[in-house]
């Protein structure tokens, strides 16, 4: 039973709250029984497992948790055990999407409407960070990820206006949908690399869609044609 704040495993979990340590160690911490069980269902086992009341004092586990309501279980996993891709012809390529909630939600959409991959550029939120993990609802274990530039062609830029209607996609819907951060959008150099531009028609009173909603709609449209 862990009874000291100075325990090495508790120190590790604290470190893994920071991206620099996740990058350096190749590990990430997962909070909550549902997310840990989702990993096991995908045949991914934790390298360490802390269970309140079994091998660690509950108050100490609560101290290292990042959740509003501390979990009963925290598992430490290897990034190397996650799926890498792309292993499909359809997916999302995210350009500097820095909000971890959006990154997690897009992973969840790729899981629900796939099979699909998610590619991430530099500057994107870490999909193995606490907020992204919670938003992905376990999809991180089932959706392959890759670097932005590894996304297969064709690239279809989702733009707020001026693109072809999304419903006019090719007959099989296979594409990499390229999305930018909500405020900045896609820079000119990325748009120049894209093969097509598509726009989701909105009502006249709506300004734009959240990036997670736009990506979800694009994957749904692609799934209807696959």
Where are these regions (language model features)?
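Short, conserved micro-motifs enriched in small and acidic residues
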Residues: 30, 100-104, 205-213
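RNA substrate-binding interface of SAM-dependent RNA methyltransferases
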Residues: 80-164
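Active-site/ligand-binding-proximal alpha/beta "capping" segment
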Residues: 157-206, 210
């Amino acid at each position: 039973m862990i009874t000291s704040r100075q325990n090495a495993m508790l120190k590790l979990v604290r470190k893994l709250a920071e991206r620099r340590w996740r990058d350096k160690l190749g590990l990430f911490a997962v909070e909550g029984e549902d997310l840990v069980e989702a990993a096991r269902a995908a045949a991914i086992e934790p390298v360490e497992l802390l269970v309140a009341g079994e091998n660690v004092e509950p108050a100490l586990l609560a101290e290292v948790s990042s959740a509003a309501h501390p979990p009963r279980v925290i598992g430490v996993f290897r990034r190397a055990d996650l799926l890498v891709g792309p292993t499909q012809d359809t997916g999302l390529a995210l350009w500097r999407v820095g909000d971890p909630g959006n990154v997690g939600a897009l992973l969840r959409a790729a899981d629900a409407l796939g099979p699909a991959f998610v590619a991430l550029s530099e500057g994107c939120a870490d999909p193995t960070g606490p907020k992204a993990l919670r938003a992905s609802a376990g999809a991180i274990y089932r959706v392959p990820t890759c670097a932005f530039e590894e996304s297969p062609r064709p690239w279809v830029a989702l733009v707020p206006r001026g693109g072809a209607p999304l419903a006019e996609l090719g007959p099989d819907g296979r594409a990499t949908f390229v999305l930018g951060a909500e405020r900045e959008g896609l820079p000119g150099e990325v748009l120049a690399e894209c093969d097509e531009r598509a726009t989701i028609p909105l009502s006249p009173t709506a300004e734009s869609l959240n990036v997670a909603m736009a990506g979800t709609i694009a994957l749904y449209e692609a799934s209807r044609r696959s």
